[in-house]
Design a protein with these regions (language model features):
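N-terminal Rossmann-like NAD(P)+-binding domain of SDR-like oxidoreductases, especially those catalyzing
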Residues: 1-176, 218, 289, 293, ...
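A glycine/serine/threonine-rich, flexible loop-to-helix segment
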Residues: 127-128, 183-191
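A short beta-to-alpha transition loop/helix N-cap that caps and shapes the active-site region
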Residues: 37-39, 122-123, 180, 246, ...
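Hydrophobic alpha-helix immediately C-terminal to the catalytic Tyr-X-X-X-Lys motif of short-chain
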Residues: 152, 156-160, 192, 249, ...
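Conserved donor sugar-nucleotide recognition element shared by glycan-biosynthetic enzymes
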Residues: 145, 153, 185, 246, ...
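Short, solvent-exposed loop/turn segments at secondary-structure boundaries
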Residues: 85-86, 180-184
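C-terminal substrate-binding subdomain of Rossmann-fold SDR/epimerase-dehydratase oxidoreductases
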Residues: 17, 56, 100, 175, ...
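Glycosyltransferase donor-binding loop in the core domain
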Residues: 75-78, 90, 181, 209-215, ...
């Protein structure tokens, strides 16, 4: 049985990856420091003999006994509401955490995939964004701690591939949504649904003309799986190329929820990207991948998940660190 280490295993994406690799017949070792992850996302796996969980901070030395075939490095705060509160930890997990995982991959002769992000493109001046675009990032802006952590992650991953021969993959993840997101993580979809569930007006920043491209989590996980199983070592965008303005997205959520609340507008945060849409030509040509779940279907699944949560979850305040 092949063995895989997944860091950030109790997070939104990490927990779905644990499910996928258990389903594929792997022995999964999950690792998470639980700063932003939630143990409830993986507790259904605890009874399984092919799943182990370690409560550990990957920015510190990592030891895993026995062989490892793959490492997926997904540990990191991913929401602005989190990384603006814990900027140094965000930088450390992107730098030290990646370094530690790469060292382990070198030792175990494992293939390693790192979770990069569309944020490496910053506030892009090229649209849509392909993998050859270098980006437009403010390294000292409030979002810079996340953007630059991920850019460094890509650089050190390429360096380990070039100079140490580590077999590596880099996925650039665009906006993703689905069950197990935190309602209070501040990102657009859970924020809109949470406000609708509580009977509050939906908050749109700026005039709402800024665009995003939302990919349902199952599609994303399939793309990551295909990339890992390929032999391609340069970055690959995985995301949904169907772009929508945040104002129109808020209107879709209102229609879905049947809520009678209104939309209110607030000032746009500093360095908030004005547009975001992946060019997925590389994923289509190399991996035969493209998203298959349309937004209406994915939104319905996600809304039903959030609505099924205990009502005290609907009004939970963002986590304090």
């Amino acid at each position: 049985m092949k063995r895989i280490l997944i860091t950030g295993a109790a997070g939104f994406l990490g927990s779905h990856l644990c499910d996928r690799f258990i389903k594929e017949g792997y022995h999964v070792i999950g690792m998470d420091n639980l700063i932003t992850g939630d143990l409830r996302n993986v507790e259904h796996l605890f009874p399984l003999p092919q799943f182990d969980f370690y409560h550990h901070d990957v920015s510190k030395f990592i030891h895993v006994s026995g062989p490892l075939d793959y490492i997926l490095h997904f540990a990191s705060p991913a929401s602005p509401i989190d990384y603006l509160k814990i900027p140094i930890q965000t930088l450390k997990v992107g730098a030290l955490g990646t370094h530690n995982c790469l060292g382990l991959a070198k030792e175990k002769k494992a293939t390693m995939l790192v979770a990069s992000t569309s944020e490496v493109y910053g506030d892009p001046q090229v649209h849509p964004q392909n993998e050859d675009y270098w980006g437009n990032v403010n390294p000292v802006g409030p979002r810079g701690v996340y953007d630059e952590a991920k850019r460094f992650m890509e650089s050190i991953t390429r360096a380990y591939h070039t100079f140490h021969g580590v077999d590596t993959r880099i996925v650039r993840i665009f906006n993703t949504y689905g069950p197990r997101m935190r309602l209070n993580d501040g990102r657009a979809l859970p924020a809109f649904i949470g406000q609708a569930l509580r009977g509050e007006n939906l908050t749109v920043f700026g005039d709402g003309s800024q665009t995003r491209s939302f990919c349902y989590v199952d599609d994303l996980i399939e793309g990551i799986y295909r990339l890992l199983m390929s032999n391609y070592t340069m970055p690959v965008n995985i995301g949904n190329p169907h772009e929508i303005s945040l104002l129109d997205f808020a209107k879709e959520v209102l229609k879905l929820t049947g809520s009678s609340v209104s939309i209110e507008f607030k000032d746009l945060p500093v360095d908030d990207p004005k547009q975001r849409r992946p060019d997925i030509t590389r994923a289509q040509e190399l991996l035969g991948w493209q998203p298959t779940i349309d937004r209406a279907e994915g939104l319905k699944i996600t809304y039903d998940y959030f609505r099924s949560l205990p009502q005290e979850e609907w009004s939970k305040k963002p986590k304090e660190f």
